[in-house]
Each structure stands twice: as structure tokens, then as C-alpha cells.
Amino acid sequence: WKAEYPSHRARAKTTVSGVLFDFNDVKAVETPDEKRIAEYEMRWQRGGLSFLGAFSDLLVDPQANATAANFVRAKIRAVVEDADTADLLTPNNIIGCKRLCIDTGYFETFNRSNVSLIDISEGRIEAITPKGVRANGQEFEADAIVYATGFDAMTGALLKIDIRGRGGLALRDKWDGGPRSYLGLSVAGFPNLFMITGPGSPSVLTNMITSIEQHVEWIRDCLVALRERGLRRIEATEQAQDDWVDYVNLVAGLTLFPTCNSWYLGANVPGKTRVFMPLPGDGHLSAADCRSRE
């Protein structure tokens, strides 16, 4: 496999997600039950995100998605012995609009005597105690506590920097109503500011390494072109940015992604404007779109 590594990387750049997954062009709703279940079973056993490539309509058609969600629910309930715990672990609506967990021994973990799943969606963690954690009026003993508080995806790191554009406008003020960009690479009013896999690009919905490389190469080519033409500044227009944001919103609206309260929408950050930030669809086509605008 390593001997063919360069060709693998080249092929990855021509795929939907930048990963050498086997994407099925057939629709789940047009596939006989037995064949559809066999496809899900094969991908479940394989593990990983390729499960969502089982059929072409899983993330655009609720009926198709329900066939996948029901399959996963049955798998989880067959593994997790406690019914209440299994219910907490199963997707309650659309599957795949949040990061997918395809089993690699994860669900079996909840059958261990020293593992408990505590639902705090309706309550909260009340206190850290000398012995562990108190939640929902009960104390849970722990030797160590790992803080998994989530992250401010796609915009958080940029907005922690005091980036200023024309007239001293701060990027955090420009994006007060949600991030807007052109191609996920630049922001109107901020000349010579380049983002890599920023909001408005396929970004986290693809293989990030492939997408990062594509953006870095585009920025490199842009800088070379500026130098060759004797130019010192490049900036997206407001109209181009508006058109691109409209396109991203149109594509996202054709999918099931915006139906979940996920970090793709910024739903995990209190007070953050709900905007679907990545561009769903074909990362290869997005790369081609960038090249067409050079």
C-alpha cells in the first residue's frame, strides 16, 4: 500500500470527501431491504465514517436516513445490555448530521461494571467533590476527571486574534451575525487575509489534510500570481462573498445537516449565532471551483 502512496493521495483529491472511501451511487430508498441491510452490515463491520457512503441519499432524504438510523439503533441495542443506557446512546432522529460513532468496541464499554453513562442534558453537573462528581443529585466516584467541554469550531481560533480590516474593523465585529467568507478563504473588507479551511469551505466534512493542502496550494498560487503581476493586495468583494454565502446556504438546505444541534452550527457554544458553517457536498468540486476562480 505504501508503495502506491503518491497515487493514493492523488486519488483522494478526486473523491467526494478527500478519503478513499467506497461511495455507493445507489439510493437506499430504491434498494431492496435485504440488499440494503447487507450493505449496512458490511460497512458496520468495517467501521469508520464510510458507513455514510453506503447510499447516496442518506444525508438528503429523511426516509433513506431512517433506514440507516434504525439499523444503528438495532446494533446498539443488541450490544448494550442496559436498556436505558442503550436508549441514551442511540440516535433519536437523523444519523450523520453530527459526527458519527461507528463501533470499534465503544458500545461494549458500557457493559463494564465500572462504566456508567450519566445523562445531564436535562440537568447539570452540580459540583466537583473530593471523591468525584455530583450530578443529578448523585455523587459519582472517580480517580481522574477529564474535561471535555467541547470547542468553538471553525471560528473560535480566528476570533481570539484581534484581526483588523479596512477602517480598523475587527473580524469579530464583522462576524457578529455569523461567519461570512468567500470560498472559505477570504473575507470582504480584510485585504490579504487568507484563511485555511475556514467557514464556507468543505473543511470538517472532508479529510482535513486533503482540504488543507488544497487551500495552501491555492494561496501559494495566488501569491505567486500577485507577485508576477506586480500587485500587493487582493480582497474579495462584498458581492462575491454574498453570492458564495448564498450558495453555501442553498447547498446546506438541501441536506439534513442543519436539522441537528451540532457544533457544525455552533450549537455547543452558548450565545453563538446559529449558522451552518461548512460547505456540504463534493470537496473535489469545491477545489475545482476554487481553481476556476484563479
Q: What positions do the PLM features span?
A:
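N-terminal FAD-binding dinucleotide-binding subdomain shared by FAD-dependent oxidases/monooxygenases
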Residues: 1-294
